[in-house]
A protein has these predicted regions:
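Cap/lid segment of the alpha/beta-hydrolase catalytic domain
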Residues: 189-269, 305-316
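Alpha/beta-hydrolase-fold serine-hydrolase catalytic core, especially in secreted/extracellular enzymes
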Residues: 65, 96-177, 347-432
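Proline/glycine-enriched tight loop/beta-turn segments at coil->beta junctions
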Residues: 160, 175-178, 185-194, 200
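N-terminal export/assembly leaders
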Residues: 19-98
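Alpha/beta-hydrolase fold nucleophile elbow
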Residues: 269-281
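Glycine-rich nucleophile elbow surrounding the catalytic serine of serine-hydrolase chemistry
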Residues: 279-291
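Bacterial Sec-dependent N-terminal signal peptides
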Residues: 1-23
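Mobile cap/lid helix-loop segments that gate and shape the active-site cleft of serine hydrolases
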Residues: 297-336, 341, 348-361, 370-373
Length: 432
């Protein structure tokens, strides 16, 4: 019995030694390696990836006993994984995200980009290159060339306190449509126009926060238009929810924004000298992209979105490689293409806009300075707030457009806005 036990132990030891040799590349299961790392560095791991069946070559040699970060880097990069620090000693193991980087990357990228231009002339040469390449990489011109020129269908007008709401359905390309709503002041005369792409907030354009903002801006004197994200709302009925997580969504949302402006700017009650764009989160990403694609905008207000180290986590924001334009760019540089026209950034301390006051905003001030118009770029930073479109952020939006478009501040009262149901805001009834 004793000899039998010794033999088994010897066989096990031999197998282990055989497994951990040069010939086997010292390979170990990735899950086992990560468990050992967690014990060594006294951390907890949460997995957003499947490590089943994955083996890591030269596994133990990748560990750096003096650095958890370097160890993670060495172990996870071969699989396109990375470790994201959470609270305390918890780390989340995630799939590599090409649009998401770290603040330190922005701190390196912004000076690099800034070194490419020292005055208005060199900046405009760079700007023109970016503008051309962004259009090409997005593929927007081929889509625009195929667009329908049919007049949009409009629904009945619903009258509220100081404004009206009317739904529309517009044919775009390849038989697709975009649906949305127009919020119009009751007052007669010429009004500024604000295109309002929405982000990934609760209930999309049907949500209370979205309606509060557009209704309030309309009461103060601006015509506001929003529309469904590709694959959300009525667009989901047409193309399915999965279509939102595609590169096509990036193209179609930009196309929809351009075509809606084409239609709205022809209205007799629209003042073409006051055309704005405003959205939050993914809607803020759309806001910046639309300013790069369409020079008819005269004011822009991206909210909780603009960053030099995050391109937008949804394929509808980063599905086409526009950030590779000009040898590599970012949303901050794309936003700079709007200079010297008025732009306000709304940022907070709880998301990727946390670096705006010391990184992206000074960078944009420099670009605006080339035109002697630093007063046209501003930043409202809310360091204690997180990623949302809360009242302080909405108030910043109101203040910006009151100042820029001369809206009637005496009408600023969100309580006067009627919150409609999704069915009321849809052009066609929701399928049961």
């Amino acid at each position: 019995m004793k000899r039998h036990s010794i033999l088994i132990a010897a066989l096990v030891a031999g197998t282990m030694c055989q497994a951990q040799t040069f010939e086997t590349k010292y390979a170990r299961p990735l899950g086992d390696v990560l468990n050992d790392v967690a014990k060594r560095f006294n951390v907890k791991l949460k997995f957003n990836v499947d490590t089943t069946g994955l083996k890591l070559n030269y596994a133990d040699f990748r560990v750096r006993p003096y650095s958890l970060e370097e160890t993670f880097d060495n172990i996870l990069k071969p699989f396109d994984f990375y470790a994201l620090k959470q609270n305390g000693n918890l780390y989340k193991i995630k799939q590599y995200e090409y649009p998401r980087r770290q603040p330190v990357d922005g701190q390196k990228l912004i000076p690099y980009l800034a070194s490419k231009y020292s005055d208005k002339a060199s900046w405009e040469a760079r700007r023109d290159t970016l503008r051309k390449e962004v259009r090409e990489r997005l593929g927007i011109d081929a889509l625009l060339a195929r667009c329908s020129d049919e007049k949009p269908l409009v629904g009945k007008t619903r009258k509220y306190d100081g404004y009206t709401v009317q739904n529309f359905c517009m044919k775009t390309v390849d038989g697709h449509t975009v649906k949305g709503s127009v919020y119009t002041p009751l007052a007669k005369g010429k009004h500024p126009l604000i295109i309002c792409p929405n982000g990934h907030f609760l209930n999309g354009r049907y949500g209370k926060v979205q309606q509060q903002r557009l209704g309030t801006l309309a009461r103060m004197g601006a015509i506001c238009v929003d529309f469904d994200l590709w694959g959300w709302g009525e667009s989901e009925d047409e193309v399915g929810a999965k279509a939102h997580q595609t590169a096509e969504a990036h193209q179609m949302q930009a196309l929809n924004g351009i075509r809606i402006l084409d239609w709205m700017i022809k209205r007799k009650d629209v003042d073409k000298s006051r055309v704005g764009v405003n959205g939050g989160s993914g809607g803020g990403t759309q806001t910046v992209l639309l300013t790069a694609l369409d020079d008819r905008y005269t004011a822009a207000n991206p909210v909780v979105s603009l960053s030099s180290w995050f391109d937008g986590g949804c394929p509808c924001e980063s599905g086409m490689p526009i950030q590779l334009s000009g040898g590599g760019t970012c949303n901050a540089e794309i936003a700079a293409m709007f200079a010297p026209k008025p732009m306000m950034l709304v940022s907070d301390g709880g998301d990727w806009t946390s670096t705006t006051p010391e990184l992206e905003y000074p960078y944009l001030q420099r670009i605006y300075g080339f035109y002697g118009k630093t007063e046209n770029i501003s930043n409202v930073h809310l360091p204690k707030e997180r990623h949302d479109f809360g009242p302080n952020k909405r108030n910043a939006v109101y203040d910006f457009f009151i100042k820029t478009f001369k809206l009637d501040a005496s009408k600023l009262d969100e309580s006067k806005v009627t919150i409609e149901t999704e069915d009321q805001l849809r052009f066609y009834p929701k399928k049961k």
